[in-house]
A protein has these predicted regions:
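Acidic, metal/ion-coordinating pockets
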Residues: 1-154
Length: 154
């Protein structure tokens, strides 16, 4: 990617589940990562089918994943609490209450291009999630002051 490029090739992996999912993504990116400018993955079930360990988070970075999104299962592995505040590629649902650790959006710069990433979760059977519509709209407007490129995982 460079500042004169008019298109950005983004690949987004849906819910990566357990070791088979991690291996599939690792092997795919080892062969095809040069075809994409930015790689996003939903990783909330990547560690043994539930949650995300810090080791697997770091493995995904090594595989070439630029941004990671998640949902309610991110909390299934308790070690998430020891690293989520420093996990600069991880985006938890933005419509969780403000006191929930982690961040619901971030801007990630790669090769001179700033890309906004927002994550949201639905409310059905998700007790602590706030309505996402106003929150997401406001966040998109905030990010668009910095970059026109915004990826939304819902």
């Amino acid at each position: 990617m460079n500042n004169t490029k008019s298109t950005i090739k983004i690949i987004f992996f849906g819910d990566i589940v357990g070791k088979p999912g991690r291996i599939a993504v690792r092997d795919f990116l080892a062969e095809h990562s040069d075809k994409y400018d930015f790689v996003v993955a939903n990783i909330e079930n990547a560690s043994h089918g539930f949650g995300l360990t810090e080791k697997n988070y770091n493995d995904f970075i090594e595989y070439g994943i630029d941004a990671m999104t998640c949902g309610n299962h991110i909390w299934d592995k308790k070690d998430i609490y020891s690293y989520i505040d420093n996990a600069d590629r991880l985006v938890r649902p933005i419509n969780y209450p403000k006191n929930v650790r982690g961040t619901g959006s971030r801007i990630i710069e790669k090769n001179g291009i700033k890309i906004g990433v927002i994550n949201s979760i639905g409310r059905v059977f998700m007790g602590l999630a706030d309505s996402q519509w106003d929150i997401v709209r406001d966040e998109i407007l905030k990010i668009k002051k910095i970059t026109p490129v915004v990826i939304m995982d819902f």
